[in-house]
């Protein structure tokens, strides 16, 4: 049986940290930025850790295969 492939969309959107946590970028930073204030755009630059256990396990499974 051939090897399973990693999920291409998940590879582009998520990174695994050294501790095994999953990092992702925040949404709403693509366009229509003139109506968003500077504080909001600055906060959208930061990446966040996926907290929800169900989502975290699903993402790990997509990345590991």
UniProtKB/Swiss-Prot annotation:
Alphabetical list of InterPro entries matching this protein: Ribosomal_bL35, Ribosomal_bL35-like, Ribosomal_bL35_CS, Ribosomal_bL35_sf
Coiled-coil ranges from the UniProt annotation = none
- A single GO BP: translation
Cite the entry's keywords alphabetically: Ribonucleoprotein, Ribosomal protein
Molecular function, one GO term? structural constituent of ribosome
Q: Name one GO cellular component term.
A: cytosolic large ribosomal subunit
UniProt superkingdom: Bacteria
Instruction: List the biased-composition ranges (Basic residues).
Output: 1-45
* Stored PROSITE patterns: RIBOSOMAL_L35
Q: Keyword Ribonucleoprotein on this protein? A: yes
Tell me the protein family, please. Answer: Belongs to the bacterial ribosomal protein bL35 family.
Name of the protein: Large ribosomal subunit protein bL35
Name the gene behind this protein.
Answer: rpmI
